[in-house]
Protein backbone atom coordinates (compact mmCIF):
# COMPACT_ATOMS: atom_id res chain seq x y z
CA UNK A 1 0.00 0.00 0.00
CA UNK A 2 1.36 3.42 -0.75
CA UNK A 3 0.45 6.73 0.84
CA UNK A 4 0.05 9.85 -1.22
CA UNK A 5 -0.15 13.33 0.19
CA UNK A 6 -2.16 16.09 -1.28
CA UNK A 7 -1.43 19.77 -0.83
CA UNK A 8 -0.73 21.59 2.43
CA UNK A 9 -3.34 20.90 5.08
CA UNK A 10 -4.88 17.93 3.30
CA UNK A 11 -5.13 14.57 4.93
CA UNK A 12 -2.98 11.64 3.77
CA UNK A 13 -5.13 8.99 2.14
CA UNK A 14 -4.36 5.41 1.34
CA UNK A 15 -4.42 4.31 -2.26
CA UNK A 16 -4.36 0.67 -3.28
CA UNK A 17 -1.72 -0.55 -5.69
CA UNK A 18 -4.31 -1.36 -8.34
CA UNK A 19 -5.42 2.28 -8.44
CA UNK A 20 -8.62 1.78 -6.48
CA UNK A 21 -9.08 4.41 -3.76
CA UNK A 22 -11.67 2.47 -1.74
CA UNK A 23 -10.93 2.03 1.94
CA UNK A 24 -9.41 -1.39 2.45
CA UNK A 25 -10.50 -1.51 6.09
CA UNK A 26 -6.97 -2.06 7.35
CA UNK A 27 -7.30 -5.83 7.24
CA UNK A 28 -4.44 -8.29 7.05
CA UNK A 29 -4.89 -8.90 3.31
CA UNK A 30 -2.78 -6.48 1.35
CA UNK A 31 -3.74 -5.20 -2.07
CA UNK A 32 -1.14 -7.11 -4.06
CA UNK A 33 -1.92 -10.58 -2.69
CA UNK A 34 -4.45 -11.41 -5.41
CA UNK A 35 -2.02 -10.50 -8.18
CA UNK A 36 0.51 -13.05 -6.96
CA UNK A 37 -1.50 -16.15 -7.80
CA UNK A 38 -3.68 -14.98 -10.66
CA UNK A 39 -2.95 -14.03 -14.21
CA UNK A 40 -4.77 -10.91 -15.37
CA UNK A 41 -8.37 -11.53 -16.39
CA UNK A 42 -7.48 -10.26 -19.85
CA UNK A 43 -4.87 -13.01 -20.33
CA UNK A 44 -5.39 -14.97 -23.54
CA UNK A 45 -5.57 -18.71 -24.00
CA UNK A 46 -2.01 -18.77 -25.34
CA UNK A 47 -0.80 -16.98 -22.20
CA UNK A 48 -2.44 -19.60 -19.98
CA UNK A 49 -1.03 -22.41 -22.10
CA UNK A 50 2.48 -20.94 -22.05
CA UNK A 51 2.35 -20.50 -18.27
CA UNK A 52 1.14 -24.08 -17.81
CA UNK A 53 3.75 -25.53 -20.16
CA UNK A 54 6.61 -23.66 -18.51
CA UNK A 55 5.43 -24.65 -15.02
CA UNK A 56 5.09 -28.30 -16.02
CA UNK A 57 8.48 -28.46 -17.72
CA UNK A 58 10.20 -26.78 -14.78
CA UNK A 59 8.50 -29.01 -12.23
CA UNK A 60 9.35 -32.21 -14.07
CA UNK A 61 12.94 -31.22 -14.81
CA UNK A 62 13.59 -30.40 -11.14
CA UNK A 63 11.93 -33.51 -9.74
CA UNK A 64 13.02 -36.01 -12.41
CA UNK A 65 16.35 -36.98 -10.79
CA UNK A 66 14.60 -37.54 -7.45
CA UNK A 67 11.92 -39.65 -9.14
CA UNK A 68 14.50 -41.75 -10.96
CA UNK A 69 16.30 -42.45 -7.68
CA UNK A 70 13.00 -43.25 -5.95
CA UNK A 71 12.07 -45.66 -8.73
CA UNK A 72 15.42 -47.37 -8.46
CA UNK A 73 15.09 -47.69 -4.68
CA UNK A 74 11.60 -49.21 -5.04
CA UNK A 75 12.42 -51.60 -7.87
CA UNK A 76 11.82 -55.29 -7.31
CA UNK A 77 15.29 -56.41 -8.42
CA UNK A 78 17.75 -53.76 -7.29
CA UNK A 79 21.46 -54.12 -7.85
CA UNK A 80 22.77 -56.40 -5.04
CA UNK A 81 25.80 -54.12 -4.59
CA UNK A 82 23.58 -51.08 -4.08
CA UNK A 83 23.13 -50.20 -0.44
CA UNK A 84 21.19 -46.97 -0.35
CA UNK A 85 20.47 -45.33 2.99
CA UNK A 86 18.60 -42.26 1.73
CA UNK A 87 17.52 -40.58 -1.49
CA UNK A 88 20.42 -38.14 -1.27
CA UNK A 89 22.89 -40.96 -0.57
CA UNK A 90 21.51 -42.97 -3.47
CA UNK A 91 21.75 -39.98 -5.81
CA UNK A 92 25.37 -39.41 -4.76
CA UNK A 93 26.26 -43.06 -5.26
CA UNK A 94 24.56 -43.25 -8.67
CA UNK A 95 26.38 -40.13 -9.87
CA UNK A 96 29.72 -41.41 -8.54
CA UNK A 97 29.45 -44.92 -9.97
CA UNK A 98 27.40 -44.43 -13.16
CA UNK A 99 28.13 -40.85 -14.14
CA UNK A 100 26.61 -37.40 -13.71
CA UNK A 101 23.99 -37.76 -16.45
CA UNK A 102 22.56 -41.12 -15.31
CA UNK A 103 19.76 -39.68 -13.09
CA UNK A 104 18.75 -37.38 -15.98
CA UNK A 105 18.46 -40.15 -18.55
CA UNK A 106 15.06 -39.86 -20.25
CA UNK A 107 14.40 -36.31 -19.07
CA UNK A 108 14.06 -35.00 -22.64
CA UNK A 109 11.17 -37.37 -23.36
CA UNK A 110 9.50 -36.45 -20.08
CA UNK A 111 9.76 -32.74 -20.88
CA UNK A 112 8.30 -33.22 -24.35
CA UNK A 113 5.23 -34.81 -22.79
CA UNK A 114 4.99 -32.50 -19.77
CA UNK A 115 4.84 -29.29 -21.79
CA UNK A 116 1.71 -30.02 -23.84
CA UNK A 117 -0.01 -31.88 -20.98
CA UNK A 118 0.43 -29.06 -18.48
CA UNK A 119 -0.42 -26.43 -21.09
CA UNK A 120 -3.74 -28.11 -21.78
CA UNK A 121 -4.45 -28.71 -18.09
CA UNK A 122 -3.69 -25.12 -17.06
CA UNK A 123 -5.72 -23.62 -19.91
CA UNK A 124 -8.72 -25.88 -19.16
CA UNK A 125 -8.53 -25.17 -15.44
CA UNK A 126 -8.35 -21.38 -15.81
CA UNK A 127 -11.13 -21.24 -18.40
CA UNK A 128 -13.47 -23.46 -16.39
CA UNK A 129 -12.62 -21.61 -13.18
CA UNK A 130 -13.54 -18.28 -14.73
CA UNK A 131 -16.81 -19.70 -16.08
CA UNK A 132 -17.90 -21.52 -12.91
CA UNK A 133 -16.93 -18.68 -10.58
CA UNK A 134 -19.43 -16.52 -12.43
CA UNK A 135 -22.12 -19.18 -11.89
CA UNK A 136 -21.46 -20.10 -8.24
CA UNK A 137 -20.20 -16.93 -6.66
CA UNK A 138 -20.67 -13.60 -8.37
CA UNK A 139 -18.17 -11.68 -6.23
CA UNK A 140 -14.67 -13.15 -6.10
CA UNK A 141 -13.54 -16.74 -5.86
CA UNK A 142 -15.66 -19.81 -5.11
CA UNK A 143 -13.85 -22.74 -3.53
CA UNK A 144 -16.54 -25.10 -4.79
CA UNK A 145 -16.11 -23.89 -8.36
CA UNK A 146 -12.32 -24.18 -8.13
CA UNK A 147 -12.58 -27.75 -6.80
CA UNK A 148 -14.93 -28.80 -9.57
CA UNK A 149 -12.63 -27.24 -12.16
CA UNK A 150 -9.59 -28.99 -10.72
CA UNK A 151 -11.27 -32.38 -10.86
CA UNK A 152 -12.79 -32.00 -14.32
CA UNK A 153 -9.70 -30.51 -15.95
CA UNK A 154 -7.56 -33.31 -14.53
CA UNK A 155 -9.92 -35.93 -15.93
CA UNK A 156 -10.03 -34.17 -19.28
CA UNK A 157 -6.26 -33.95 -19.48
CA UNK A 158 -5.62 -37.67 -19.08
CA UNK A 159 -8.62 -38.86 -21.10
CA UNK A 160 -8.29 -39.54 -24.80
CA UNK A 161 -9.48 -36.67 -26.96
CA UNK A 162 -11.89 -38.84 -28.94
CA UNK A 163 -13.70 -40.64 -26.11
CA UNK A 164 -14.40 -38.78 -22.87
CA UNK A 165 -16.37 -41.63 -21.25
CA UNK A 166 -13.42 -43.59 -19.70
CA UNK A 167 -12.14 -40.53 -17.85
CA UNK A 168 -15.54 -39.47 -16.57
CA UNK A 169 -16.35 -42.94 -15.25
CA UNK A 170 -13.90 -42.31 -12.39
CA UNK A 171 -15.95 -39.39 -11.04
From Swiss-Prot:
Chemical reaction(s) catalysed: Fe(2+)(in) = Fe(2+)(out)
Signal peptide: none
Keyword Secreted: no
GO MF term list: ferrous iron transmembrane transporter activity
Protein transport listed as a keyword: no
Solcar repeats: from-to residues: 43-131
Source taxon at top rank: Eukaryota
Predominant location category: mitochondrion
Gene Ontology BP annotations: iron import into the mitochondrion; positive regulation of hemoglobin biosynthetic process
Gene3D superfamilies reported in the protein's UniProt record: Mitochondrial carrier domain
Transmembrane segments: 45-64, 105-125, 143-163
A Pfam family assignment: Mito_carr
Gene Ontology CC, one term: mitochondrion
Region (Disordered): 1-40
Subcellular location(s) per record: Mitochondrion inner membrane
Residue stretches in coiled coil: none
InterPro entries: Mitochondrial_sb/sol_carrier, Mt_carrier_dom_sf
Keywords: Ion transport, Iron, Iron transport, Membrane, Mitochondrion, Mitochondrion inner membrane, Transmembrane, Transmembrane helix, Transport
Topological relation to the membrane, as annotated: Multi-pass membrane protein
Purpose of the protein: Mitochondrial iron transporter that specifically mediates iron uptake in developing erythroid cells, thereby playing an essential role in heme biosynthesis.
Entry's family note: Belongs to the mitochondrial carrier (TC 2.A.29) family.
Subunit structure: Interacts with ACB10; this interaction stabilizes SLC25A37 and enhances the function of SLC25A37 to import mitochondrial iron during erythroid differentiation.
Name of the protein in question: Mitoferrin-1
Origin organism lineage: Eukaryota, Metazoa, Chordata, Craniata, Vertebrata
